[in-house]
Amino acid sequence: MNIEKFTTKFQQALQEAQSLAIGKDNQFIEPVHLLTALLNQQGGSTAPILTASGANLPLLRNELNAELSKLPQVSGSGGDVQVSRSLVNLLNLCDKLAQQRQDKFISSELFLLAALEDKTLGDVLKKCGVKKENLQQAIEKVRGGQNVNDPNAEESRQALEKYTIDLTARAESGKLDPVIGRDEEIRRAIQVLQRRTKNNPVLIGEPGVGKTAIVEGLAQRIVNGEVPEGLKNKRVLSLDMGALIAGAKYRGEFEERLKAVLNELSKEEGRVILFIDEIHTMVGAGKTDGAMDAGNLLKPSLARGELHCVGATTLDEYRQYIEKDAALERRFQKVFVGEPTVEDTIAILRGLKERYEIHHHVQITDPAIVAAATLSHRYVSDRQLPDKAIDLIDEAASSIRMEIDSKPQPLDRLERRIIQLKLEQQALQKEDDDASRKRLAMLEKELGEKEREYAELEDVWKAEKAALSGTQHIKAELDSAKTQMEQARRASDFAKMSELQYGVIPALEKQLAQAESAEGKEMTLLRYRVTDEEIAEVLSRATGIPVAKMMEGEKEKLLRMEEELHKRVIGQHEAIEAVSNAIRRSRAGLSDPNRPIGSFLFLGPTGVGKTELCKTLANFLFDDENAMVRIDMSEFMEKHSVSRLVGAPPGYVGYEEGGYLTEAVRRRPYSVILLDEVEKAHHDVFNILLQVLDDGRLTDGQGRTVDFRNTVVIMTSNLGSHLIQENSTLDYPSMKELVMSVVGQHFRPEFINRIDETVVFHPLGKENIREIATIQLARLIKRMESHGYQLHFTDACLDFIGEVGYDPVYGARPLKRAIQQEIENPLAQQILSGKLLPNQLVTIDYVDGKVIANQ
C-alpha cells in the first residue's frame, strides 16, 4: 500500500489512528481506530458527510468506543504496532473505489464506503442509521462532481462553510442587530446588485458610519422577503479574511483557498452575495514575488458577473488601494455612506436600545439616547455618528452594570480608606514620639467613624441588590419569543404565530410591567437606569470636558469665581471679570458652540500678573496649575517654525510626530492655552490662529481636524507697556484706547477683530505689592511647616518687604528676589547653625533697619 497516494487529510488520520492504537496498548491498527480518528479530525469532511447521510453521531461515537474497548491489549510491546489485515483490505478497497472515480489520490470519504463492507464497522454504521444510498449522495454532494487530483483536495472542499459567515442564517436566528434608516443606501446597493454585469456595489464611508450594518440590513430584508424578485432567497455570506489567510504556510496555498471559494460561488449560479468587509485588504493579500494577489484573482469573476460581491471600505483606504488599481475599481460601483444626522442617530439608538438593555441587564431611558447623540456630535469631533453615540450608550450601561455587580463606589472608597488607615495605624503603633501618638489618636477616631459608615452602607447595598428582581430574565424571554414569532411568520406557521402573538408575548409583557413597577422604588446606592447624567459622566471621563450637570457646590464656586481668582491675582479686576464671565457662559451652555470658550489678549507691563492669571485659571478649572498648554511664542520667531505648532507637512522630517499645539489639544480637548509673549512670534503664526479664534478648529500636518471649541485661548503681550507706565493715572477706557493704538500697528485688523476681549493690566501699586508679599510669604510658611518650623511675620516685616520689593517698572517680580535676600537667606543660615529649633514658633520682625528672627 503506497501511503503517498493518500490525501494529506487521510495521511493525518492514519497517523492519529496509530497514536490511538499505541495509547490503548493495541498491537494492531484496526479499521475502528481509523474511523474514530476520521470522526474526530479537525476540519475533516467525515463528520459532515455522516451527518448529511442521517447518522446519529453521538451514538456512533459510543459504539466505536465500545468496539475499541473490546480489542485485545498487549503490554510491554515497546509501542510497536502494525496495520491489521482487515485495515489493509479496506484500504485496498478504497484504492479500487478511487480508480473507479478516476481519482489520482485516495480521499478519506471513500473509507466510509469501504467501511460499510467491513463486518464490524458495517454493523456499527447501519445501527447508527447510515444507508449506502444516502452516504453515496452525501459524498457526491461534498465532492461537487470533482476528481481528487491533488493531495490537498479535501482542504479546499466546503470552502464556503470554512471561510465565510452566513449573514442570512444569523438574521434568521435573530443574532443581527436591527438596522434602522439607511433606506437610500440599501436601495442603491440593491439597484447595483440587480445589474447584469458589474453588479458589485462597494460601500464607501468614514469609519463608524454603519457600512457593515447596511449589509446586515440587506441580509435581514432578504430573510423577510422585502427585496425585489431577483434577490429573493439569496444568501449573504461574509468572507472571513482571517480564516482564509490563517495557516496558509506554503506558497500558493492562500490562492488555492480563495480559488476554491470562487469555484463554489460560481457553482451557486448567483444564489450567493459575497460580502467582503475591509475590501482593500484583498489588494496585495498573498502577494509574493511572481504570485498574484487576491485582487487579481477576483477580477475575472467580478467582470463576468459570476461573483455577486458587496465591498466595504473607508474613503482613505479606497483611495490608497483600490483607486490605484483602475481595473479593479471599474468592476465596482461606488455607494457613498454619509454620516447620519443627530435625528437619524437618535432613531438608530432607539432601535438598538432593547438589545443593549438585555445584554447589560439595565434600563436605558430616552433622555439618555438623545443625550448620547447630541453630546457625542458636539464634543467628540474626531469620530463619526452613530458609532460614537452607540459607544457612549454601551459604556454608560456597562458602568451601571458594573456598579450593580460589584461594590458601589462609595463602599469601595470607604473600604480602601479603611485599609489605608489600618496600615497607617500599624505603622504608628511602633512609634513612641508625641507627634505619632497624637496622630494615632486622631487616626483611630477616624477609623471608627469610617467602619460604622461602611457597615451601614453595606446593609443598604445588600437590601437594594435583593430588591432588583429578575426583569432581565423576562426581557430575554420576550426577545426570544419575538424572534420565534418572526421565524413562524416566515415559515407561514400561523398556529405557532398566533400562540406567540396572543398568548406568550402578552403574558411576558404583563410580567415585565409588574416586575418593573416593583423595581421602581427609589434606590440610594444602586442605579439600574441609564440617564442623560450617566452619558454626560462617561463623556466627561473620556474627553475631560465638563458636560455633566453641575453640582450645587460647583455652581457656587462659579458664582464666586472672581473671589477665588483674586486670592492669587491681586488687582486687575477687569481681566478677572472678563475671564470669569467667559467660563460661566460656557458652563451655563450659552457660549457659541462653534468658537472657543473665550479668547483674550492680555496687555500690560512685565510682572503685573498676566501669566499668573492663566495659572490661577488652570488651577481653578482643573485643580492643577500645570494643566494648561503653555507655548512661549518667542520660540516661533522664524517663518519656518510655524510648522512646529501644527506638525511638519508630508515628506518632511517629523511628519509622524504631529504638532506641538494640535497634539496637546487632541489629548486634552478642555484646556487653557497660554500663548506667552505673543508679539515676539512671526506674523505667519497669527494666520494659523485666525481659524482657531473664529471657528474653533485647526487642521494639523496630517490632515486631521483638531477641535478648539472647548479651550480658553489667552495671549499675553508687553505691547504698549511704556504707555501704561507713563499714563498710570488715566481712567481704564482712556488707557485701553491709548494701548490699542499701538496694538493696532503691530497686529492685523482681522486678528484683533477675532479676539473676544482685549484686557489691559494696570501697573501694580505699593498696596498691591504688600498683598502679593502676604501671598508669597504664606507659601514660605507652608514650606517651612513641612520641615517642622512655624513662622509668623509681623506687620512691620510685611511693610518692609513690600517697600523693598516695590519697583514700578518690573512689577511683582523683584518681590521674589527681596524675599530670598532679606528673609530666606538669613533663615537658612540660622537653621543650619542650630539657632532655630523645630516645633517652636519663629517670629520674624523688622527692627532698626534689620530683619530678625526670634524664637
Curated annotation (Swiss-Prot):
ATP 1 binds at residues 205-212. ATP 2 binds at residues 604-611. Gene3D superfamilies: 1.10.8.60, Clp, N-terminal domain, P-loop containing nucleotide triphosphate hydrolases. It comes from Pasteurella multocida (strain Pm70). Residues 340-544 are annotated as: Linker. This is Chaperone protein ClpB. Its main location: cytoplasm. The gene is clpB. Residues 554-763 are annotated as: NBD2. Residues 158-339 are annotated as: NBD1. GO terms for cellular component: cytoplasm.
